[in-house]
Design a protein with these regions (language model features):
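Catalytic core segments in nucleotide and nucleic-acid processing enzymes
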Residues: 33-191
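Residue(s) in the substrate-gating loop at a strand-loop-helix junction
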Residues: 1-31
Length: 191
């Protein structure tokens, strides 16, 4: 995708862009996917801010790296999509809007490795940040449900933290979408 954008930028700068070809279609699809992904993240965050404003704090917070020395050059920013907090409980949600919520290798469906590594890293760094306080930190990968036959809906206990992977069905009436989001908050925060 980066090469595609670079190539299009080059053609535009050089004045060589003349047609609405497959390249333009791919670019528009890419931009639409990026917008939809951001919209999905923002929808979930704003839903929790509005519907649980007096019960849960909802933000898109940065999580500081918990380093053993002061060397932090070249480390990426850990920017959560959604971080929900209530008292001593924290739920970090990484919202994923993909065409395929699972990867398939050798006819076996598995979670996207990079997504799992990302949420695990967020959770463990937040856990360590709060080590001096009584707390519980959990993570969730929340995929927009696709039309695939197999989709994730699992809860894992990893190194002392709960990591949940589930889907949000956006093809339902809004009241049922809201019920799905409410259930996440109610179960996690015992509301």
């Amino acid at each position: 995708t980066y090469r595609l954008l670079s190539a299009i930028g080059y053609l535009v700068v050089k004045g060589l862009w003349q047609t609405h070809s497959d390249v333009l279609t791919k670019l528009m699809d890419f931009l639409d996917d990026q917008r939809m992904c951001r919209l999905y993240e923002k929808f979930i965050l704003e839903y929790y801010r509005r519907e649980f404003k007096n019960q849960i704090t909802a933000n898109a917070s940065q999580i500081p790296w918990q380093l053993d020395n002061d060397e932090n050059s070249m480390l990426p920013v850990m920017q959560s999509d959604i971080m929900l907090q209530r008292d001593d409980r924290v739920l970090i949600i990484d919202a994923k809007y993909y065409e395929h919520s699972m990867q398939v290798q050798f006819n076996k469906h598995t979670l996207h490795s990079a997504n799992l590594y990302q949420i695990f890293t967020y959770v463990k760094n937040k856990e360590y940040e709060l080590r001096e306080k009584d707390h519980t930190v959990s993570g969730m990968l929340l995929y927009a449900k696709t039309d695939e036959e197999i989709y994730p809906n699992n809860v894992y206990q990893m190194s002392g933290n709960q990591i949940t992977v589930r889907t949000l069905d956006l093809n339902l009436p809004f009241t049922e979408i809201a019920e799905q989001l409410d259930t996440i908050a109610k179960l996690h925060f015992s509301l």
